[in-house]
């Protein structure tokens, strides 16, 4: 895998930095594991914008990724690594011994021909999935479940990982990349190693059009709008003279948004600022 800076053959290419991985499959994805992925344009079922700056972009098919990794005791061979337009991480197509194929998140160091396995008897090596009560303390894991059997929810983006720092009876304590320390049930599964494609963070799109290809629309400052469009709009100068708010009048800097008291007891230490 290499980080390549493009030659300035045009203004749009001058600042482009891309990640090149010659090991990625160059053909079409595995058709039985594809689903239609309709674009919402950031609108809900009432047609109202619920998420701004979304719209357009290239058509994409959704790859059905196995986040549960629940085929216990059946070894699988990695057939190939693939690009996935729906996430920052790459995915791997694996063939199980019983003939079934599934997509999984590609951990760092995984390559075609490698063997992986799930279950309590799986070896402690990157790509294998086990309940966290069977994983040594201090190990680095990804695709971590928060409820047994629900499928991985933590550490799924490119280059991310979680560290198991303690095990106490029915719970393990995890250190997340944000600095948060959190308890989850020891029967929750996790995949050993960290997610691959860590160089994803080094890429530079180089021009606004590349963001539009990805379905990202422009972000306009509230102070540049009219009063009818935003609480910061209007006025003769640039100062809006009030506390920063969203277009709907909600405080936007420092206001707490978390309201899940039910799971507060599982957070040992809050994330670092």
Curated annotation (Swiss-Prot):
Cite a single GO MF annotation.
Answer: rRNA binding
User: Can the keyword NAD be found in this entry's annotation?
Assistant: no
Name of the featured protein: Large ribosomal subunit protein uL2
PTM N6-acetyllysine: list the residues: 242
**Protein family per UniProt:** Belongs to the universal ribosomal protein uL2 family.
- The answer to keyword Cell cycle applying to this record is no
The biological process GO terms on file are:
cytoplasmic translation; negative regulation of DNA-templated DNA replication initiation; ribosomal large subunit assembly
In UniProt terms, what function does this protein have? One of the primary rRNA binding proteins. Located near the base of the L1 stalk, it is probably also mobile. Required for association of the 30S and 50S subunits to form the 70S ribosome, for tRNA binding and peptide bond formation. It has been suggested to have peptidyltransferase activity; this is highly controversial. In the E.coli 70S ribosome in the initiation state it has been modeled to make several contacts with the 16S rRNA (forming bridge B7b, PubMed:12809609); these contacts are broken in the model with bound EF-G.
> Keywords in UniProt for this one?
Acetylation, Ribonucleoprotein, Ribosomal protein, RNA-binding, rRNA-binding
Output a single Gene Ontology CC term carried by this record. cytosolic large ribosomal subunit
Give the quaternary structure: Part of the 50S ribosomal subunit. Forms a bridge to the 30S subunit in the 70S ribosome, contacting the 16S rRNA. Interacts weakly with S6 in one of the 3.5 A resolved structures. In pull-down experiments interacts with CedA.
The protein's matches in Pfam families, at most eight in alphabetical order, are given as:
Ribosomal_L2, Ribosomal_L2_C
Regions of biased composition (Low complexity) lie at 39-48
Source organism superkingdom: Bacteria
